């Protein structure tokens, strides 16, 4: 009777048209209800509806109103929070397999089975990779998952490493070795084994990929400059372009340096032995000859050759720094030739630092945090390491070598893997200009600074460098940290473009081919030019993978560090330990404070800062918190914090600001 009834169809259309649909992301609470966070509003999700969804699901819902109360009824799934995910195994009282998702806001226990290829017997707490197979909104069934990969046992002390690598789909083993390695040389190598090359690395370094030789250039008995000879290990001499090793390196893109150990991009036989520039061993290398005047300015064009080299001495950063800084009871070079190389490289470095301070941009010293681990992976201590003079000596040599390689590739290959950075994001040029003027301008200089910081000028290499030098004199970190928010990301490009972050017009790395795939690509291109071949254009897929891998490696490093910090700090909560810190971020939820002593990130909820929410105002433009109309906390501000709670299972560290 009602079938094909036009009036009924019209009624259905009217009812559907009267519904108010919204789209948003599900957010759970510590109760059975939740919220749908939409672009402009937040809607209550009742407990019955929450059973259909999971935290993070993107859904479409219908708004229901009862007087002035609003809630939503879930309509459909737009995008699930979970597809592939990390979880811990749990067996319920009936012995049924369930999975506890490794996410701080997902408390569901998901029923699961195990893929046949997973042969390890599972126990409570074991770490696994799983795939969500069914979703109530998509499949008209309850949540159900399947274990697809075993990661490690519950009591494995190295779980932070293995779980994080699995989360980001990164390998945990080196590339498999070949039975043998043969040279693939197409050009004859020059014999440079007579030059007194030295390496400077950390004491534990095995993959030594750069060695240096430096000498003064003289005219009529007067020194006029420096000749730097940069020898870089040449793994492409052993790796055919279509080999399995090449393909693996192209996928990995970088050696992954993790707390306690690394996972090399190449087989260890290549990275740590056959290609490593160990002392007194003849090694194939790509060598660049670079000449400067006494002011550190590059003179002429760099020359590149394929060569044989032999490192004469393996030096260590701290020992060389102690020697040059005349630290008490310092190490001393064991021969005059080594001492001479250290002295000359030191003089060359000072000239280059001075040149870069005037013509490019210097790095602001921040210090690097490193974990000292016991054999079982426990954190014994956390150290902050600053770049000392020996580190700067290698840094300056590598920077000038990369500048010269970029110029060479641009001129002769017309392609390459170029490191570029365009400074401020184009959409942030006007906000950056406004912030600079609000912070630095006064009645006397406003007109000149307005022109100096115009969007057009800030987007140029010269204008950006001027601005950076202007703010160097300001001790307040908030200036630097605020400006950082307006920057775009560095990019790999196949054609040369400026790197504003370095203040340099051309930059392409080739000095770490054992550790970076982009450097391997640049090696091949330089060697193609040297052998009079047409250089093959760098594929966009290579650049995209480099960009993606760099991001993945940073996330891996961050996630492992967060886990280790939680382990390290947990025992300190009961000790009421206080730390000096610096506010790194201000968000709607609270402050993010970096502990200066060890680099840990501590979250301070807004609710602990003031007892009246109505008197607090968060300013996203200023990245600041106002209390009773006065700015109380802002990015870059020094504060003292005390640990309040550490949850290792969610890697969260919560603290209080001490007034």
Curated annotation (Swiss-Prot):
Molecular-function annotations in GO: exoribonuclease II activity; RNA binding
Ranges where the RNB domain occurs: 189-532
Top-level taxon: Bacteria
EC primary class: hydrolase
GO cellular component: cytosol
InterPro entries named in the record: CSD (IPR011129), NA-bd_OB-fold (IPR012340), RNase_B_OB_dom (IPR013223), RNase_II (IPR011804), RNase_II/R (IPR001900), RNase_II/RNase_R (IPR004476), RNR_Ribonuclease (IPR050180), S1_domain (IPR003029)
Subcellular localization: Cytoplasm
EC number(s) recorded for this UniProt protein: 3.1.13.1
SUPFAM superfamilies linked: Nucleic acid-binding proteins (SSF50249)
Keywords associated with the record: Cytoplasm, Exonuclease, Hydrolase, Nuclease, RNA-binding
Listed PROSITE patterns: S1
Pfam families: OB_RNB, RNB, S1
GO biological process: mRNA catabolic process
Catalytic activity from the UniProt record: Exonucleolytic cleavage in the 3'- to 5'-direction to yield nucleoside 5'-phosphates
Domain S1 motif: start-end pairs: 576-658
NCBIfam families, per database record: 3_prime_RNase, PRK05054.1, RNase_B
PANTHER family: EXORIBONUCLEASE 2, RIBONUCLEASE
Recorded family membership: Belongs to the RNR ribonuclease family. RNase II subfamily.
Physiological role: Involved in mRNA degradation. Hydrolyzes single-stranded polyribonucleotides processively in the 3' to 5' direction.
Protein name: Exoribonuclease 2
Annotated source species: Glaesserella parasuis serovar 5 (strain SH0165) (Haemophilus parasuis)
Name of the gene this protein is made from: rnb
